[in-house]
């Protein structure tokens, strides 16, 4: 059996500071913005020459936060309610023989400043600090296949939860809008995807959760109509 080694070419800077609540696929949270910082010796303007002409990129990365758990021959995809098992190669699970992931993201801009090359990304589904091993331009003529079959994931998941904010939090968000544009929209889009494990989606109202997004510990509770954000704590 052959073995290969790869060098990290970059690192992701993302508003998702932990695995919990990261969207399960790219593009689900449109308001999410992040960056890919190229590392030496790949942080050269020449390395991204012409890339600005593409609207989307494939980002190949390492599941660095789950790789110690090893791989599993079968997993429980969230799209199947967390009950049915599928072969790992029939899923996008992180528990793979080689912990490599791929994400299709929007390229919103490129900044080249001295020794820094930064790609501005949209629709991100990667946790902050994710190691990147390659990027490739997305080619619609070859990679957009409307006739393709996708088993249990044929259709895009729909935002399934109504998200509201207490009066106090709504006022706090208004005050933060200048420094954190679209913060309210971002929080609402993330929580609307319902980040809870599938087995907890029938919980009674009152159960509380928290997640770090950007510089805030966002706390919300389950209500009869969805989720209500009741606290926004700074680090």
Which residue ranges define each predicted feature?
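Flexible glycine-rich active-site/ligand-binding loops centered on an Asp-His dyad
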Residues: 119-153
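Enriched for short, Lys/Arg-rich terminal
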Residues: 217, 222-235
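Active-site-adjacent substructure of cysteine-protease-like catalytic cores
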Residues: 47-101, 193, 199-205
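Short, conserved beta-turn/loop elements at beta-strand boundaries and strand-helix junctions
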Residues: 17, 109-116, 225
